[in-house]
Amino acid sequence: MSNYWLNIYKPRGISSAQLVSIVKKILGKTKIGHAGTLDVEAEGILPFAVGEATKLIRLLIDARKTYIFTVKFGMQTNSGDCAGKVIATKDCVPSQEEAYAVCSKFIGSVTQIPPAFSALKVNGVRAYKLAREEKKVELKPRNITIYDLKCLNFDEKNATATYYTECSKGTYIRTLAEDLALSLQSLGFVIELRRTQVGIFKEENAIRIKSPDEITKNALEAKSIKIEAILDDILVLDATDSQAQQIKYGQKCLFNYEKDFRHLAKFAYREEFKGNTERSTTAYTLVREDASTGLTYKLPLEVEFGKMSIDLLWVRYKGTLLAIGSLNKSCFNSLRVFNLTQDFF
C-alpha cells in the first residue's frame, strides 16, 4: 500500500519540517505532506499524507481540532509562548472562579488577529521573519469558531490555568490565550500546548517518533490508515464504467438523480448499509437505516428535483476512491482525481 495516512505525534522541541524529514528518511518517499503545522514548542497530532493522500490534505486542514494548553498569567511575550522574550508584565492574576467563568465568553464565532510570530505572509514574506527582525507586522483579523472551551485546572501558586478547546481551522491558540488573559484584566502566554485531535486522528492512536532509528519502514506502514478514512462523513456515489471513464479523463459526467441518487446515503468507511429515500412533493430526504440497532436516521440533506447541488462528495469505482468534487444540477465537477487503480479499464 503506497497511498495512506499516518497519525504521527510531533514531540516538543522539533519543527514540523524536521519531522517530515524524519518520516521521509524512514519511508524513502518524496511525496509526503502533513496537515497543519505545529510550532516548535508545541506537541501533538500531526497527520501525514503519503502518495495520493496528499491530494486530500486540504480537507484535513479544514477539519476541527482539539488542544490542551496552559496559560501563564501576569506576563506577555513577543511570540505568545515561552520561546519569546517577555515584553510586558502586570501584577494581576485572575481567581480560580474567574479563570473558569471566562470560557463562556469565547464560545461561538470569534474574531482573532493572528500573532506576529506566524507563518502567514506579509507582502510575500513570512510574518515570523519580520517579527524576528523587530519589524512592524500588521495582520488582518480572521473569523474563527470556538466550539468548546473549558478550564481543566487552575494553579494559584504558579498563576497558571490549563484549558481544553475544540476549534475551527485558522485558530491560533497563542492568540486565544492572550485574549483570555486580557478578558481577565491580565496578561498571559502559552507555556504548554498539545494538539490532541485533528479530524479523525486522535492522540491515543498516534505514532511517536523522534528519530529515523526508532521505527522501521514496515512497522510504520503497518500503522497506516487507508486513504478514504477522512471521507467518513462525506456522501459517496458509485460510478459505472462509463461514468468512471468520463471522470478519469476530465470529461463531463452526469448522474441520474432518479437512479444514482437513490443510494447516495452511503458512508463507505463505516460498515456498509443501504440507503433509501423518502419522497415529498419537492424533494428527496435521504435516510440511513442502522441494521445493528434497527434505528433510522434522516440525513441532513434534501435533494431538490432538477437541482441536485451538493458542495462536496466523493465518487468511487469498484470500491476504490476515484475522485472528490461537487455536484451542480446532477453534473459532477472534479476537484481531485486519484490514481489508485492499477488496471483502470
UniProtKB/Swiss-Prot annotation:
Signal peptide: none annotated. CDD domains: PseudoU_synth_EcTruB. One of its GO terms (biological process) is tRNA pseudouridine synthesis. It catalyses: uridine(55) in tRNA = pseudouridine(55) in tRNA. Keywords: Isomerase, tRNA processing. The keyword Isomerase applies. The active site is at residue 39. Pfam families: TruB_C_2, TruB_N. It comes from the Bacteria. GO terms for molecular function: RNA binding; tRNA pseudouridine(55) synthase activity. InterPro entries: PsdUridine_synth_cat_dom_sf (IPR020103), PsdUridine_synth_N (IPR002501), RPE1 (IPR005728), tRNA_psdUridine_synth_TruB (IPR014780), TruB_C (IPR032819). Its EC number is 5.4.99.25. Disulfide bonds: none annotated. It is an enzyme of class 5 (isomerase). Belongs to the pseudouridine synthase TruB family. Type 1 subfamily. Responsible for synthesis of pseudouridine from uracil-55 in the psi GC loop of transfer RNAs. HAMAP family: TruB_bact. NCBIfam families: RPE1, TruB. This is tRNA pseudouridine synthase B. It comes from Rickettsia rickettsii (strain Sheila Smith). The gene is truB.
